[in-house]
């Protein structure tokens, strides 16, 4: 069982690197713009029900907050900076989505091998380390979009 956890954790970190490599390669393709406006869960109530607020708190109060310093805001942010911040958030979101897909391949392999518990552990790690961060980025992008909409109405 320990082997399942260590392997899953290792593959999750490797998947982050794969995501960081794949995203810039695909950013030059036409369909990338469609990917940058994905929104899987638009309802804030559902986000709360699946524990996204708790996940956000855990990220903000753990060592994970240091993983992408470009996504931390220490001061009041200007409108132009907010748009750059949103673009960086989109990149981070897509990194995690591609990492989720990469790790999904390993999960499918384990299922075909009949290692169902191993696949379940990997799926849990994949959800926590790739899907939830992506959902959190989408949630934060929607918040930024609402704020930008208000700023555009005022000007």
Annotate the PLM regions.
Residues 1-41, 95-113:
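Long, highly hydrophobic alpha-helical transmembrane signal-anchor segments
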Residues 2, 11-17, 21, 41, ...:
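Weak global preference for isoleucine
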Residues 3, 7, 11, 87, ...:
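Alpha-helical transmembrane segments of integral membrane proteins
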Residues 28-81, 85, 150-155:
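Membrane-proximal soluble regions of multi-pass membrane proteins
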Residues 78-99:
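Loop-to-transmembrane boundary segments
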Residues 95-142:
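Hydrophobic transmembrane alpha-helices
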Residues 135-155:
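Cytosolic/matrix-facing juxtamembrane and C-terminal tails of multi-pass cellular membrane proteins
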């Amino acid at each position: 069982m320990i082997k399942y956890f260590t392997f899953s954790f290792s593959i999750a970190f490797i998947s982050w690197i794969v995501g960081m490599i794949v995203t810039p390669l695909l950013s030059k393709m036409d369909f990338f713009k469609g990917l940058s406006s994905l929104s899987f869960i638009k309802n804030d109530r559902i986000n709360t029900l699946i524990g996204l607020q708790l996940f956000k708190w855990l990220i903000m109060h753990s060592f994970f907050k240091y993983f992408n310093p470009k996504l931390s805001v220490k001061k009041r942010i200007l409108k132009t900076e907010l748009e750059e911040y949103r673009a960086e958030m989109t990149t981070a979101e897509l990194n995690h989505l591609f990492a989720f897909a990469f790790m999904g391949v390993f999960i499918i392999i384990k299922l075909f091998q009949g290692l169902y518990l191993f696949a379940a552990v990997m799926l849990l790690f994949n959800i926590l380390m790739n899907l939830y961060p992506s959902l959190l980025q989408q949630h934060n992008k929607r918040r930024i979009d609402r704020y930008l909409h208000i700023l555009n109405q005022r000007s």
